[in-house]
């Protein structure tokens, strides 16, 4: 994408297959966290496993500079299917060559699930490119004040939910990108506390669409030093039905697949590498789980401490985590949840702060 005096143009799209062989630049800590049950090679396909987008942008730039397209770049923009769906809602429907119409309600489902049912992997890339290109071209052409306001409002909401990132490598511009909340990292603010919960699929599959989450964050104490304590409940349910199991391909279900060494989990069972981050200057205690959760450890990655484990969620099953969070004494706002983006805007998080009020 190029911007010249307010004129925005979108260049050619390239499949990540072009960049897989260009290697990685991950640290020993990053490899340690993502070493099993599925080993992440940290080629271009794995870079969003790291919840600090500043680090992801750095690694993406490294890969780009190794490619045949190498050039100086000003920053990195990343979008997901929900961002594309919201742009379709603003710009208008897209009709595919098979007659299917993508709207502001069904585009994310198509890109996260339907496309894998309707087309083989080689054809999928063609449709991804077509949809993304049409959306990005449409988003920044024929701009009106109303359209600009709709896009600006959507970008703020989408960035908060990690569906949109915009990161600049220029320090003098950082306040307008990183400083405006467009490039989220794992919790790093003591005054505006967040607890981070991030998920990475270990069963090579497309099961993410079938995972539904719910969370409750309940304030339990306002402490004398100015910190607050909360109880967090976080659940993941695998909604895959027996009918869907019978009709879906191994590309969606995972399990034993051509070109994938070993079986991390049976077909249809999601295996999630979970990462739990305390608020900056705070702590997580008393972490327990119901369901099939294994291999819990304390780790450090990119300068931040975390707790990690692996949750195995069979079709129809639920895994639930419970733990307590204490914020920094410098906290000036209520605790919020930062999590891996899903395919919908409603994050299904309930906040209860009735126990006490911030001082």
Where are these regions (language model features)?
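Non-catalytic, solvent-exposed segments at the cell envelope interface
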Residues: 1-348, 356-358
